[in-house]
Curated annotation (Swiss-Prot):
This is Glutamate transporter polyphemus. The name 'polyphemus' derives from the Cyclops in Greek mythology that failed to guard against Odysseus as mutants are unable to defend against microbial infection. InterPro entries: AA_transpt_TM. Probable glutamate transporter which transports extracellular glutamate into the cells. Regulates the production of intracellular reactive oxygen species (ROS) probably by controlling the synthesis of antioxidant glutathione. By regulating ROS production in blood cells, required for maintaining bacteria phagocytosis following infection with S.aureus and possibly E.coli. Keywords: Amino-acid transport, Cell membrane, Membrane, Phagocytosis, Transmembrane, Transmembrane helix, Transport. Disruption phenotype: RNAi-mediated knockdown in adult blood cells results in decreased survival following infection with S.aureus. Adults infected with S.aureus display decreased phagocytosis, increased bacterial load and increased production of reactive oxygen species (ROS) in the hemolymph. Phagocytosis of latex beads is normal, however flies pre-injected with S.aureus display a significant decrease in subsequent bead phagocytosis. Increased survival following infection with L.monocytogenes. Increased extracellular glutamate in the hemolymph. Belongs to the amino acid/polyamine transporter 2 family. It comes from the Eukaryota. One of its GO terms (biological process) is sexual reproduction. It is a multi-pass membrane protein. One of its GO terms (cellular component) is extracellular space. It is found in: Cell membrane. Its main location: membrane.
Length: 460
């Protein structure tokens, strides 16, 4: 018998699978009774190097180019401090989430669960009065994951169209930016139809090369003509910090992509840990983001745009090469981040007759709809800064803080929260931070988008 494909959901009718909540004794010993990593079967697995490359590709993109704008909202000192603290918080929450998802696998005796499945299992393990909300909570988590990745892919399309428009305006007739969005969608169509993560690794490698080549070339403009550093703010008023957090959150993490990479690894045990793939990747990402944020703000000050590529000259050959490299790198990032959406949407898809025969066709249709829906939103509200802030605030609050904390609260309900209830206190703090930041950050970004959409309607 062939091993079960990684892309298929476990058969919950299998009598060998545990479907009922475990007792306290069973929960405590579950680690020693079942190791889900040994049971996983991935059709085309990622090596640790593949996973590292894919993680960099997931996170490094338009966010790093927006970090100078983030530092404009915080100042040098406060931006550095908040970047480090935010990365520690986000990385810790990812570790907590993956550890809890692994515990869900042990309790249900299955090789792997998706994030929505983990939420459902956690609700079933919690107090009796919330057990009935498990499926609804799992469905809501799916919606949150899909919407977060939808916003991210929309940001990518807006970024690509803006940069290629600047190049096009110099050589050909000035066309509306929305035409560039449409062309980008058409060119992405064949790449977005790739259905195996392993086969996206070459694209990710090319994308990383283009991005870092562009980053290296842009140093010429960043270091040429640096003003006196005393002309820049060290600490800005606290009212502006919320924008920094939203932009930095967008540039520092991508929960859905991080989970998909871990799920497709040949050796997922190497993902976490002090010197695991995840920690090494986020350290590299943090240093890169801080460097770009500090140098970009130092060079351009209050005139910095939502992407640093929009600050460099439009009519110079070097600047045009930079924009082509970086925009092409971001363009090639879209298939990987869109892959996350498809994985989430089909993780619980029943591979039964007759629908199983049409699963591939349905997946292609969903991919097509997703691509052109992101294009439609990019055409309607091409505000790069506001979209970046909205995606950062939405994903940080829901995926990085609320979901991991709620899963942990309910999973530990029967087992206990440790001495002085420290786990419960930690989870409550994560929930409060997520709620406050989510409400404030999303409100600010949505107000900007509404104003921009009104301007779009008036210009038609």
């Amino acid at each position: 018998m062939e091993p079960k494909s990684q892309d298929q959901a476990p058969n919950r009718d299998d009598p060998d699978l545990q479907t009922e909540p475990l007792t306290i004794a069973q929960s405590i010993t579950s680690f020693y009774m079942y190791n889900p990593y040994e049971k996983r079967s991935v059709e085309v697995p990622l090596t640790n190097c593949d996973a590292f490359i894919s993680l960099l590709k997931c996170v490094i993109g338009t966010g790093i180019l927006a970090m100078p704008l983030a530092f404009r909202c915080s100042g040098f000192v406060m931006g550095t401090v908040m970047s480090i603290l935010l990365m520690i918080l986000l990385t810790y929450s990812i570790h907590l989430l993956i550890a809890d998802m692994t515990e869900c696998c042990r309790r249900r005796r299955v090789p792997q669960v998706s994030m929505p499945e983990a939420v459902r299992i956690a609700y079933e393990e919690g107090p009796k009065w919330i057990n009935c909300f498990g499926r609804a909570a799992g469905f809501m988590t799916t919606c949150v994951l899909v919407f977060g990745q939808f916003l991210l892919c929309t940001v990518y399309l807006v970024f690509v169209s803006k940069n290629f428009k600047e190049i096009g305006d110099h050589y050909i007739e000035r066309y509306n930016e929305r035409y560039y969005v449409l062309v980008a969608c058409l060119l992405l169509l064949p790449l977005f139809m790739i259905r195996r993560l392993k086969y996206l690794v070459p694209l990710n490698l090319i994308s990383n090369f283009l991005l870092y080549a562009g980053f290296a070339l842009i140093m010429y403009y960043l270091f040429n003509g640096l003003p006196n550093i005393n002309d820049r703010e060290m600490v800005t008023p606290p009212v502006e910090w919320i924008e920094f957090i939203a932009i930095a959150a967008f540039s520092l993490t991508a929960v859905g992509s991080m989970l998909v990479v871990e799920a497709h690894m040949a050796h997922p045990q190497s993902y976490l840990g002090l010197f695991g793939v995840l920690n090494l990747a986020v350290l590299f990402i943090l240093l890169s983001n801080m460097f770009f944020g500090i140098i970009g703000y130092w060079r351009f000050g209050d005139n910095v745009h939502a992407s640093i590529t929009l600050n460099i000259p439009q009519d110079e050959i070097l600047s045009q090469f930079i924009k082509v490299f970086i925009a092409s790198g971001i363009f090639l990032s879209y298939p990987l981040n869109g892959f996350v959406v498809i994985t989430v949407m089909f993780s619980d898809y029943e591979n039964s007759e007759p629908r199983g025969r049409y699963r591939t066709l349905i997946e292609y249709v969903v991919r097509l709809l997703f691509l052109f829906l992101t294009g439609a939103v990019a055409i309607g509200v091409p505000n790069l800064a506001a979209l970046t802030e909205l995606e950062g605030a939405f994903s940080l609050s829901n995926l990085n803080l609320l979901c991991p904390a709620l899963i942990d609260v309910f999973l530990n309900y029967n087992v206990g929260y440790g001495r002085l209830m420290w786990k419960l206190i930690r989870d409550i703090l994560l929930i409060l931070i997520g709620l406050i930041f989510g409400i404030v950050g999303c409100t600010v970004a949505l107000m900007q988008l509404i104003r921009d959409f009104q301007l779009t309607l008036n210009s038609m």
